[in-house]
Amino acid sequence: MINLRKTHPLMKIINHSFIDLPAPSNISAWWNFGSLLGICLMIQILTGFFLAMHYTSDTLTAFTSVAHICRDVNYGWLLRNLHANGASMFFMCLFLHVGLGIYYGSYLYKETWNIGVILLLTVMATAFVGYVLPWGQMSFWGATVITNLLSAIPYIGTTLAEWIWGGFAVDKATLTRFFAFHFILPFIIVALAIVHLLFLHETGSNNPSGINPDSDKIPFHPYYTIKDALGAVLLLLVLLLLALFSPDSLGDPDNFSPANPLNTPPHIKPEWYFLFAYAILRSIPNKLGGVLALLASILILLIIPLLHTANQRSMMFRPVSQTLFWILTADLITLTWIGGQPVEQPFIIIGQLASMLYFLLILVLMPLAGMFENYMLKPKW
């Protein structure tokens, strides 16, 4: 009998991607985050689709439509809580996935890595426009502050900002177009994720040792399907615990007040997953300089493959690079904390030092550590 999964044009693609795919035998739990991101994306698209059925993208009714979803729509409160906290889980998985790529040298698959960085930027854009939709105080002022950064661009800045707003300030036109963006971008993310996988399957997965694993591969199914299923159960458990027991713990209390252009909140800040970049933006007193630093904090990921100096791919056997990696992790946690603090001492100087350390680690110290480790591994006799 002909095996359908190996001959059918559609089933064949799925088979080569998720069933008979040769995978390294030693990939650890860090490799689960790719599939977890896929699950997060599906959860977000499904919950978002049902929320969009009841939401109205008009400044007069947006806030009340969200309240209506939570109060009157059957399980609307659950949909909203899953969608809002699903975004937090999405970013948690994203940051860990990027961390894995840096630690184990997966960035040397340049096409996969570059598409991944574009994916990260697209997800960040989607989350930003999505945060504006409930039209609470923090939604409105967050949109005002971040879109205003465009006006720092020389010559065309103000025109560009007004073009994005659809007027002279964040208003009805802005909310309507942000809803349109928030609806279309997840489908672009799906397309990019498919391209990301396409490039990954050209080379095959990396593994913790960083050594070519071709001599020892195992089929993806059942070994890694069961492993991914365990990861999925744990992800859903954490998401449900968050959404059911503490749904507002990661949000901002100001967003329970309807947007009011005449009343500025005492401390404008984005969601927790943007705080590290927000801290870098605020650490530079100049507006244009801050915007450039903000962009550089993410786009620096694109040049990481060019800064790889070590003879070994992975950091598994490179203790100096490992130490710097964990300092970088601590630095990003510090920046996240600073981003949520008011602009006053000692937070200003801590933010500036942490921002400097972030760029110093990636651009100077980690490449130097790679060269030092190469030197230490050379025979000295």
UniProtKB/Swiss-Prot annotation:
Which cofactors is this protein said to need?
heme b
The record lists a ubiquinone as bound by: 201
* Residues that, per the record, bind heme b b566: 97, 196
Pfam families attached here? Answer: Cytochrom_B_C, Cytochrome_B
Subcellular location(s) per record: Mitochondrion inner membrane
Q: Could you tell me what the cofactor note in this record states?
A: Binds 2 heme b groups non-covalently.
Which PROSITE patterns has this protein been placed in?
Answer: CYTB_CTER (PS51003), CYTB_NTER (PS51002)
First-listed, main subcellular location of the protein, grouped into a coarse class: mitochondrion
Question: Per UniProt, where does heme b b562 bind?
Answer: 83, 182
* One example GO MF annotation: ubiquinol-cytochrome-c reductase activity
One GO cellular component from the entry?
mitochondrial inner membrane
Q: Where are the transmembrane segments?
A: 33-53, 77-98, 113-133, 178-198, 226-246, 288-308, 320-340, 347-367
Q: Which domain of life is it from?
A: Eukaryota
List keywords of the entry alphabetically. Answer: Electron transport, Heme, Iron, Membrane, Metal-binding, Mitochondrion, Mitochondrion inner membrane, Respiratory chain, Transmembrane, Transmembrane helix, Transport, Ubiquinone
> What Gene Ontology terms for biological process does this UniProt record contain?
mitochondrial electron transport, ubiquinol to cytochrome c
Q: How does it sit in the membrane?
A: Multi-pass membrane protein
What's the stated role of this polypeptide? Answer: Component of the ubiquinol-cytochrome c reductase complex (complex III or cytochrome b-c1 complex) that is part of the mitochondrial respiratory chain. The b-c1 complex mediates electron transfer from ubiquinol to cytochrome c. Contributes to the generation of a proton gradient across the mitochondrial membrane that is then used for ATP synthesis.
* Additional remarks: Heme 1 (or BL or b562) is low-potential and absorbs at about 562 nm, and heme 2 (or BH or b566) is high-potential and absorbs at about 566 nm.
Q: What PANTHER family does its record include?
A: CYTOCHROME B
> What is stated as this protein's family in its record?
Belongs to the cytochrome b family.
This protein's assembly is summarised as: The cytochrome bc1 complex contains 11 subunits: 3 respiratory subunits (MT-CYB, CYC1 and UQCRFS1), 2 core proteins (UQCRC1 and UQCRC2) and 6 low-molecular weight proteins (UQCRH/QCR6, UQCRB/QCR7, UQCRQ/QCR8, UQCR10/QCR9, UQCR11/QCR10 and a cleavage product of UQCRFS1). This cytochrome bc1 complex then forms a dimer.
Q: What is this protein called?
A: Cytochrome b
Q: Which organism is it from?
A: Phascogale tapoatafa
* Protein's gene: MT-CYB
